[in-house]
Design a protein with these regions (language model features):
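Charge-enriched, short contiguous segments at helix-coil
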Residues: 198-284
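Short non-catalytic regulatory patches outside canonical folded cores
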Residues: 125-221, 246
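Short, positively charged low-complexity motifs
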Residues: 2, 15-18
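N-terminal, intrinsically disordered charge-dense segments
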Residues: 28-34
């Protein structure tokens, strides 16, 4: 029986990727087989690597586009990380698109996309609010304080007498007062950050969602006075770690795949709105 060189077979299939539906259909299985083989032997041959890279890179923006998209981020380390995350999200999408991902691969695609985009949204909003531009505003400062209840300090002699008066239904009523204390910045939730960004005029509605036929997530929780765009960002962040292994059920995968596509489509309006607000406030 003649042995088939999987690397040669993969190379020939990859060269036909864009023109043959049959090669495209079987490419996922071929590349997975190649991956197992090459993990034992060596990396993909240069011809295969170059073809895959060319496919993944051909529709992606150049470096200048990414630099301009995050030009408001003055922290060079954070900026590099955000750009890298965005590039990786798009590159991985192209990989899975080329594989015509299904089942486990599709679930992997969705989980990676959601995690990456949610991380970009969160890190960017946090930076704009707390690190660079609006940290001194009352709206942001309110996020860093919280109301707490503290019991009154009552002398022991008086406390015993008071306890007799403050005993009801088998329980002791503890007198306390309400005060403000500093809140740990790590405890500020993403939805609170989005609401603050909306109140500051950083995040607004997007025109395409004014149409009754607009592509809006069906299960977002509308917040009074806030546009669907903000609610979508909150929903995207909520589900980033909620895609469980049982999500291979088709309707779950379809939902999260749609969500990951919306996450990508919302990234540009998100960045544009931040830049517009910063320009309007004379901060850029």
């Amino acid at each position: 029986m003649e042995l088939v060189d999987m690397r040669d077979l993969g190379s020939r299939a990859v060269m036909r990727w864009g023109s043959s539906p049959h090669a495209r259909t079987n490419l996922s299985r071929l590349l997975l087989s190649l991956l197992l083989l090459e993990m034992i032997v060596m990396p993909f041959e240069k011809e295969i690597r170059d073809t895959i890279l060319a496919y993944c890179m051909r529709d992606l923006p150049n470096d200048i586009w990414y630099e301009n998209s995050f030009d408001f981020v003055k922290d060079s380390s954070l900026k590099a990380r955000l750009i890298s995350e965005f590039k990786n999200a798009r590159f991985m999408y192209k990989i899975f698109e080329g594989l015509a991902a299904e089942d486990e691969l599709l679930l992997a695609e969705v989980k990676m996309q959601m995690l990456m985009y949610a991380s970009i949204f969160e890190a960017t909003i946090h930076y704009v609010l707390f690190d660079q531009y609006y940290k001194s505003t009352p709206i942001v400062q309110n996020l860093l304080t919280q109301k707490v209840h503290k019991p009154f300090s009552i002398p022991t002699g008086q406390l015993s007498a008071i306890n007799k008066l403050l005993f009801h239904d088998g329980k002791t009523i503890i007198p306390y007062f309400e005060t403000l204390q500093k809140r740990d910045i790590t405890k500020v939730r993403f939805d609170e950050k989005c609401i603050a960004a909306f109140q500051l005029g950083i995040l607004t509605g997007i025109p395409e969602q004014n149409d009754s036929t607009a592509d809006i997530l069906p299960d977002i929780k509308q917040i009074a006075g806030m546009p669907p765009f903000c609610a979508e960002l909150i929903r995207i962040y909520e589900v980033r770690n909620a895609i469980h292994l049982h999500a291979e059920l088709k309707k779950e995968i379809d939902y999260h795949l749609a969500l990951s596509k919306i996450a990508y489509r919302r990234m540009q309006p998100f960045l544009n709105q931040i830049r517009t607000k910063l320009n309007a406030d004379g901060l850029l």
